[in-house]
Design a protein with these regions (language model features):
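Active-site neighborhoods and metal-handling regions in enzymes and metal-associated proteins
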Residues: 1-358
């Protein structure tokens, strides 16, 4: 199309690109419309995946007459399961591409550590981190999180000035030209030196992070790894005077979610939350492992199924002190037998710490 060439330059045709990867037949959108109309007339099953992009939702509406609000429930479960099976186990070539993304991600994070100084804005550091991704021929895998408010899970950079004595949390990753992603988080003191209180919490998160790496083996349910980490975390919170009671009972009641209100990790690949548009219950779980959607924190567990060789998952424990959550649980006396609210009040200005690797 000459208009496309004028605006975007010459590109390979769909036919040429398809032939290069072994696809025998291609057509334009008009031809696809005819194919779909014939299939609908013959009452054939048309398989499609849950769309993520708005323009694809419009195309499905034009092709199949399915309203965007009904497309997720109309998507093919057979195709979803087939694609999840195919994409869950990464090939050596995919692992190599993920490693390439990880190398760029490392440069992004070390840049943040170098530039984060008292007097610099969060926006400045976040912008430089993004620039590193672009300068190495990639893009950011997701909007970079860089904030002194680590207790906010997705705290985007603001014009707030970095202050001595506070912690900065950086959650960032690169997406390569072939669309494979990295996703790492580091938390560090703005002035380069932890206070004792910060170091105490950091060491707990680090212990949980390292334990997850040790426990995560082929054949192990990732949900079991998650809850093993929750037990370690709660034991350490008891040692610091922030929690109390029987650890097994506390974790069963969900008391650990005061500190860790999310799951241990998620699948990685061509999406930073790989295949998330298929619904995490279809990606991170199976008939053997089902999430508890009723319990706060546990309902955010994205990955619970048995690990297989070739899976790529994140390991991202954290400890967060969220003032609104502390106040709400205190008012409701939720898990009061397991939490020391007076001590928790002393940590309302702490923020949060997360450590994440793929």
């Amino acid at each position: 199309d000459i208009d496309d060439i004028v605006w975007y330059g010459s590109v390979d045709s769909v036919k040429d690109m398809a032939e290069a990867v072994g696809v025998a037949n291609t057509t334009n959108m008009k031809g696809l419309k005819t194919i779909c109309n014939n299939a609908l007339r013959e009452h054939k099953k048309i398989h499609f995946l849950p769309p993520y992009r708005a323009d694809i939702k419009i195309q499905i509406f034009d092709l199949l007459g399915i309203h965007p609000n009904q497309q997720k429930e109309s998507a093919s479960m057979d195709l979803i399961h087939a694609v999840v099976k195919m994409r869950s186990v990464k090939t050596p070539e995919e692992i190599e591409e993920l490693e390439r993304a990880a190398v760029i991600g490392y440069k992004m994070h070390t840049t943040a550590m170098i530039l984060a100084k008292p007097g610099v804005t969060e926006k400045f550091v976040g912008g430089q981190v993004d620039g590193i991704a672009h300068s190495y021929g990639s893009m950011v895998a997701f909007p970079t999180i860089f904030s002194q408010h680590g207790e906010i899970m997705h705290g985007n950079p603001s014009m707030a000035v970095l202050e001595s004595g506070r912690l900065a949390l950086c959650d960032a990753g690169a997406e390569t030209i072939n669309h494979y992603c990295s996703d790492n988080t580091r938390t560090f003191p703005v002035n380069g030196k932890f206070t004792q209180r910060q170091l105490d919490i950091y060491k707990v998160v680090e212990e949980c992070h390292d334990a997850a790496l040790k426990y995560a083996k082929p054949g192990t349910k990732y949900a079991d790894v998650h809850f093993a980490i929750c037990h370690i975390l709660f034991d350490r919170m008891k040692e610091l005077g922030l929690a109390k009671g029987d650890t097994n009972a506390a974790v069963a009641a969900g008391a650990h979610a005061m500190f860790l209100p999310h799951g241990l990790g998620h699948m990685m690949g061509m999406d930073v939350h790989d295949m998330e548009s298929f619904d995490q219950i279809n990606v991170g779980f199976d008939e053997e492992t089902r999430p508890n959607l009723e319990q706060f924190g546990t309902n955010c567990l994205r990955m619970g199924r048995r690990l297989e060789e070739g899976f790529v998952v994140t390991d991202e424990p954290g400890i967060y002190f969220i003032p609104a959550l502390i106040d709400e649980w205190r008012a409701k006396k939720h898990c009061a037998e397991f939490l020391n609210f007076d001590k928790l009040d002393e940590y309302k200005d702490f923020g949060g710490i997360r450590l994440e690797d793929d």
